[in-house]
A protein has these predicted regions:
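Hydrophobic helix-and-loop "lid/oligomerization" segment in the mid-to-C-terminal part
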Residues: 1-6, 13-49, 64-65, 69-72, ...
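Divalent metal-coordination and catalytic microenvironments
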Residues: 9, 19, 74, 100, ...
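Alpha-helix N-cap/helix-initiation motif
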Residues: 9-12, 117
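Short, hinge-like loop/turn segments at secondary-structure boundaries
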Residues: 47-52, 115-118
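Active-site cofactor/cluster-binding pocket
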Residues: 54-114
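Short, basic, helix/turn surface patches
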Residues: 56-65, 127-132, 212
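Short alpha-helices
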Residues: 101-171
Length: 222
């Protein structure tokens, strides 16, 4: 079972899907916990459902049904128990793996069999893109998984501008070789004209206070 932080974002889903496909190829049953009602990856989620991942996702409220004594819980992009999408699953699982790049907090998960922590990595998606290369050619991600991983990296690095290193670009090059289409990934970040205009209105209303831009929004903007 793969899970991440509450209110799933692109780096979490990218890392989850990046692990899902190779693990499934190994003949293991694997599920990704995703709250379909409250997440920030609706466009990528819908796209993955059309690309063969329709059975990959489960809701948090039914995740416990998939947990047994032998279940391995892989937690990505978070390392504190109270931020996990399904904390009750974590409490029940005896075998836990953590993959995260954030600075270690005081209340970190201390019972993991593997705690893969790399604060110099740009994102959890980058870390997973590196890990799956060691699985061998037989268990490599498909193009859909590669695009999900690349999308996660692009979001966390602001299109490869912030927090990038040599390994970031090496991971991106690997995903490109695995079939990731950069044009399709870019489309995941596209918004409608209406949403763009609404954002522009918000930005134009910003007030500068102590070198910070502050906006007041009275309605929800996608």
């Amino acid at each position: 079972v793969v899970t991440g932080v509450q209110t799933c974002a692109l780096p979490i889903l990218g890392a989850g899907v990046g692990l899902y496909y190779p693990i499934q190829q190994m003949g293991k049953q694997v599920k990704i916990i995703l709250n379909s009602r409250a997440n920030m990856v609706k466009q990528l989620h819908a796209r993955l459902l059309e690309q063969g991942f329709e059975t990959a996702f489960i809701e948090p409220e039914v995740a416990l049904d998939y947990v047994s004594d032998d279940t391995l819980l892989i937690i990505v992009d978070v390392h504190t128990p109270h931020f996990i999408e399904a904390p009750e699953v974590y409490k029940k699982c005896k075998n836990v793996v953590v993959i995260d790049h954030h600075r270690k907090m005081v209340d970190y998960i201390d019972n993991a069999v593997i705690f893969h922590h790399e604060p110099y990595a740009s994102s959890a998606s980058e870390m997973v893109a590196e890990l799956v290369q060691y699985f061998g050619d037989k268990f490599k991600p498909n193009s859909a998984a590669a695009e999900a991983l690349l999308a996660g990296m692009m979001l966390d690095t602001k299109n490869f501008i912030l927090r990038t290193g040599v390994r970031t670009f090496e991971a991106a090059a690997y995903l490109r070789r695995m079939g990731a289409d950069t044009v399709e990934v870019k489309r995941l970040f596209a918004s409608t004209m209406q949403a763009y205009q609404e954002r522009c209105k918000v930005v134009s209303s910003a007030k500068i206070y102590r070198r910070c831009a502050i906006c007041s929004v009275s309605q929800k903007i996608d």
